[in-house]
From Swiss-Prot:
Single Gene Ontology MF annotation: monosaccharide binding
GO biological process: gluconeogenesis; glucose 6-phosphate metabolic process; glycolytic process
Gene3D superfamilies: 1.10.1390.10, Glucose-6-phosphate isomerase like protein, domain 1 (3.40.50.10490)
Subcellular compartments: Cytoplasm
Disulfide-bonded cysteines: none
Gene Ontology cellular-component annotations: cytosol
EC id: 5.3.1.9
Source organism: Blochmanniella floridana
Protein name, UniProt field: Glucose-6-phosphate isomerase
Pathway: Carbohydrate biosynthesis; gluconeogenesis; Carbohydrate degradation; glycolysis; D-glyceraldehyde 3-phosphate and glycerone phosphate from D-glucose: step 2/4
SUPFAM superfamilies assigned to the protein according to its UniProt record, in alphabetical order: SIS domain (SSF53697)
Residues the record marks as active site: 363, 394, 522
Primary location: cytoplasm
Amino acid sequence: MKNINPTKTKSWKSLKKHFLNINTTHILDLFKQNKYRFLSFSTIFNNEILLDYSKNLITEETINKLIDLAKECDLPGAIKSMFQGAKINRSENRAVLHTALRNRKNIPILVDGHDIMPNINTVLEKMKIFCQNIIQGYWKGYTNKNITDIVNIGIGGSNLGPHMVTEALTPYKNHLNIHFVSNIDGTHLFEVLKKINPETTLFLITSKTFTTQETMTNAFSARNWFVQKITKSSSFNHYEQHISKHFIALSANPVEVKKFGINPSTNMFEFWEWVGGRYSLWSSVGLSIMLSLGSNHFESLLDGAYAMDMHFKNTPLNKNIPVILALIGIWYNNFFLSETEAIFPYDQYMHRFAAYIQQSNMESNGKCVDRNGYPINYQTGPIVWGESGTNGQHSFFQLIHQGTKMIPCDFIAPVLSHHPIFDHHDKLIANFLAQTKALAFGKKLEEITQEYITKKQSYIYDLNILPFKVFKGNNPSNSILIKKITPYTLGALIALYEHKIFTQGVIFNIYTFDQWGVELGKQLADDIYSILKQTNINPQYDSSTNGLINYYKYWSQA
């Protein structure tokens, strides 16, 4: 990829001038100027997903200038490099090929001169056979009972993706109970262990390196719990054989897997260094998804993602959904300086989607050094957050409607509900539509005054409160309407956001696929842990950290 500072491009300077012209425009005026604005600013993917981006502070000129920026930053070349397996993650000297995991046409993809597709296909087939054996009851626990519970132990991408997908696709799940443990807080593991039977539980230890502190702490504790349980009812001499029936590793490090006590040749499902953790649900990390849904639905998830991959790779930029969303995000982040964006899925099964995209985006593009190693003097990744509708409406929408901050929003909703109870879904969608309309157009003082006069309410009294009922509007949003949340459409939606994040990273001139910012905290935690365990050593840090350590030691011994 080319290293181009976006602020030095002609298109960036042109956008700055354009911003001065559009900054005082109201979305309401844009709709008045073009009664066909919806048609001009919407696009459909595979007759399954509709993107309406008309309720944004943009014109055709805005989009054209943003596309010029993408071209000047060589986005087309970057897309090509990623799909071809070039080592675009130069800070770690790695290719970025989560797209290869859903390469449904099986087109050869070379890394260091070797086609990686045979290995991908081998692992996928191994996953399918294994899941079939678990689901159909052929794989037995150490007391010859069927597996009933799956516990996925992992953190970050090894947890958020699989957890989100299994929740989002709950209507498609089978009889297996899926549990997720991520937090190193022992309470998380404790509460899961209370619910399960060691005779019928399968643990998935999910870690690329098999050295992640949180994951391995939980994994060792789970193994110890399991061994303690089986020694009460079985010969301790056979515990390694029993572990082989109840512990599976999902990792790229067979050496550490073996040290833990899992046989890599039989009980490990491999994934590779060119798979980033937050983009890994498509790999063996998604084993919990396949166990929950079955292999057919897992492959439908891959199919949907592949379809979006092809859309992203082949569609012109002005009709390319991930590119459009990415460019609009840059428009607000870097010119309006909005700093944040919110995601609101109006589907309760999708309640973990915002948290998943939060990690994908903020860990990817939360960078302050460009690809040349120089400090950045412009905004990069936004703060991403959200909540499922309509819960958010009764929580923080007040600030979005009448606060002082611009918060661009993505509203996501299915047309068809999996559970159409009475008129619930129509009311849900009515709220979805009402919020996007209210945010964009607001409500003027004159309208509110006229309403009070028409209703013959106490006008003299109400004059005092009318200003508090004014909605300024002009709050931008995208509406993503999905025909139905299925494995296919969810796969496409996830890939859409992945490619949006990639596009923004290219234009920001940063390395999207590393996460060095996570490392310092890990190193310090290891140092501090050793001090916490030794009562006779005084900490030698700053006064704040020293004081907190001393109080922790004092209170923990009380």
